[in-house]
Amino acid sequence: MKTSPIMANNNLHITAMITTALLLLGLSGCATFRPSVPVSNEPQYVAHTSLVNRPRLALVLSGGSLRGFAHIGVIKVLEANGIRPDLIIGSSAGAIVGALYASGMTARELELAAERMDMSLASDVAMPSLGIPWLRGELGLVRGEKLQQFVNTEVKHRAIENFPIRFGAVATNLHSGKPITFNVGNAGLAARASSSVPGLFTPPLIRNHRYVDGQLTSPVPVAAARALGAQIVIAVDVIYPSSHAEMTTPFSVMLQAFAIGAQHIKETELRQADIVIRPEIEPVGQLVFADRAGLIRLGEQATINQLPQLRQVIADR
């Protein structure tokens, strides 16, 4: 049976939308997804109350879509210079890199993990809801379950509280509009929630609430690190500058609105950091699958440039 030109065009359009969603995140996995997470292991926030065991040094990793690969370069230089954080907080793309690093991966292992990140989320496509009661659908084009499984596989299916480095993934509560830091529970689900761009990815349901991308309310979550007791905060900012947007599709317009909101919140958050590392990334579009190795090198160079100041801040505390 031949496919009509109209059907072919529709298929191409759907494929393009799916590809756009995948390119935005740039992360996926190939393992079979195990859909259920026991309620007892769903991510949640547990406040830090001890003054004795406060984290001294926190590494805060921003959102930034594919630009998040630059976070790995930052980690490479910190590791090479013996600078190890006690706490890692990530938002969106930063939550994914942060989860893997906090689980005990070395910088080299992170580079290898980056090479395993592909676009096989195409098999994770969802039928979006049309608002018709009898026709059930998802609240996004991609479920994000493959991403969840990818992260859980990489961290060896350990819960966040069992990581060697304390970790928190910041997501946005879709009901209250407030950020939450998931610092215990299922790591893959926490990273998925933190990375669920609204409209593209289905907001996961966690403890009866829907959660979307942390970049909406806390693009560089310095406040979350301070709330968990961090004394020194290194913040890494790889967020796409809103001034560099190329608005050629409905998705790019949505991303531009997303970026504008993040810029205003970001500047407030960064004022609370002790050191800010900003890799000089060329203004390529968010939907271009960028060169991983090149982004990692840019993260390295930006961190090398900040090393003298960083060492001084640590010595002074």
Task: Identify the residue ranges that each predicted region occupies.
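Bacterial N-terminal signal peptides that target proteins for export
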Residues: 2-19
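Patatin-like phospholipase
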Residues: 2, 29-89, 100-317
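Bacterial N-terminal signal peptides
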Residues: 16-28
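Gly/Ala-rich beta-loop-alpha elbow adjacent to hydrolase catalytic centers
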Residues: 90, 94
